[in-house]
């Protein structure tokens, strides 16, 4: 047994959206220890620039590397769309998985007329459309930005009538295209399942990339010989914002109130000259 097998899997998101991935890890890989980080001080990511997202992710990965994680799951579609390739290039010895490709692979197995709801940044990147059509060029894809969803979820307003009204408006153009599949293009959106399911025809199949990325993570761990053979440690939770707010909001999805550490991410990056103004590298 290698020491690295006992190391935790790092999971991060801007907030509680990544808890959908965490729950899948508990279900599919219950033997693994996990370090969960929510960048709540800087959410939502979906309206940020590419340069900002890369900077944030580099800071998070630097911190996680210091915690000796054996793998990182970017449980955030926006960072997966805008920063995955760049941070994989910077952390070559650390397996880093994004949610978009696993989600796209599942989507093409479900249907041919695929709607994607996501943050504005993910929609603008065309990441899902490109990934889906690389796998199946005959698939038709429509992407809809949903800027109000993450703030509403983080404010615990899922069952607010206003949230239903907003969801109906976002889904209308997709329903007009007679989609047969809907992808949650943001890990937060799984929390809206009760609302979205009521607004969609029963024939529309839902794709949750959280389940898909954990299946991909299991295959990667197996391939690298990094599966944990021992009893896992309790999950460590950390946030950049208010720990109490995160703990209260998380309880309804985790079934318990986590102990949450507040961390201050140091700016350990230097400008390298990248698209939209900057590229950064840990220093």
UniProtKB/Swiss-Prot annotation:
Catalytic activity: L-glutamate = D-glutamate
Function: Provides the (R)-glutamate required for cell wall biosynthesis.
The family this protein is said to belong to: Belongs to the aspartate/glutamate racemases family.
Listed SUPFAM superfamilies: Aspartate/glutamate racemase
InterPro entries attached to this UniProt entry: Asp/Glu/hydantoin_racemase, Asp/Glu_race, Asp/Glu_racemase_AS_1, Asp/Glu_racemase_AS_2, Glu_race
Catalytic residue list: 76 (proton donor/acceptor), 186 (proton donor/acceptor)
Name the UniProt record assigns to this protein: Glutamate racemase
Organism in which the protein naturally occurs: Microcystis aeruginosa (strain NIES-843 / IAM M-2473)
Gene: murI
Enzyme Commission number, as recorded: 5.1.1.3
Residues the record lists as binding substrate: 13-14, 45-46, 77-78, 187-188
PANTHER family: GLUTAMATE RACEMASE
Alphabetized UniProt keyword annotations: Cell shape, Cell wall biogenesis/degradation, Isomerase, Peptidoglycan synthesis
Pathway assigned to this chain's UniProt record: Cell wall biogenesis; peptidoglycan biosynthesis
Disulfide bonds: none
Entry coiled-coil feature ranges: none
């Amino acid at each position: 047994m290698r020491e690295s097998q006992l190391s935790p899997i790092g999971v991060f998101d801007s907030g509680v959206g990544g808890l959908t991935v965490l729950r899948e890890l508990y279900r599919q890989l219950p033997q693994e220890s996990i370090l969960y980080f929510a960048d709540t001080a800087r959410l939502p990511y979906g309206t940020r620039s590419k340069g900002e997202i890369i900077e944030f992710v580099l800071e998070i990965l630097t911190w996680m590397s210091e915690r000796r994680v054996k793998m990182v799951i970017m449980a955030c579609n926006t960072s997966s769309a805008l920063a995955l390739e760049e941070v994989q290039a910077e952390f070559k010895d650390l397996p880093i998985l994004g949610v978009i490709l696993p989600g796209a692979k599942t989507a093409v197995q479900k249907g041919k007329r695929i709607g994607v709801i996501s943050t504005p940044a993910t929609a603008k990147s065309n990441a899902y459309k490109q990934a889906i059509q690389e796998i199946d060029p005959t698939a038709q894809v429509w992407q809809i930005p949903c800027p109000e969803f993450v703030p509403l979820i983080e404010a615990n307003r899922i069952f607010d009538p206003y949230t239903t009204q907003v969801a109906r408006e976002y889904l209308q153009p997709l329903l007009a295209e007679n989609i047969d599949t809907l992808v949650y293009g943001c890990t937060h959106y799984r929390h809206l399942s009760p609302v979205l399911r009521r607004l969609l025809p029963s024939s529309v199949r839902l794709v949750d990339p959280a389940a898909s990325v954990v299946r991909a993570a299991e295959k990667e761990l197996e391939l690298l010989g990094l599966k944990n053979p021992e009893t896992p440690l309790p999950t460590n939770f950390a946030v950049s914002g208010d720990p109490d707010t995160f703990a209260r909001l998380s309880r309804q999805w985790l079934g318990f109130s986590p102990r949450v550490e507040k961390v201050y991410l140091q700016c350990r990056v230097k400008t390298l000259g990248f698209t939209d103004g900057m590229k950064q590298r840990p220093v």
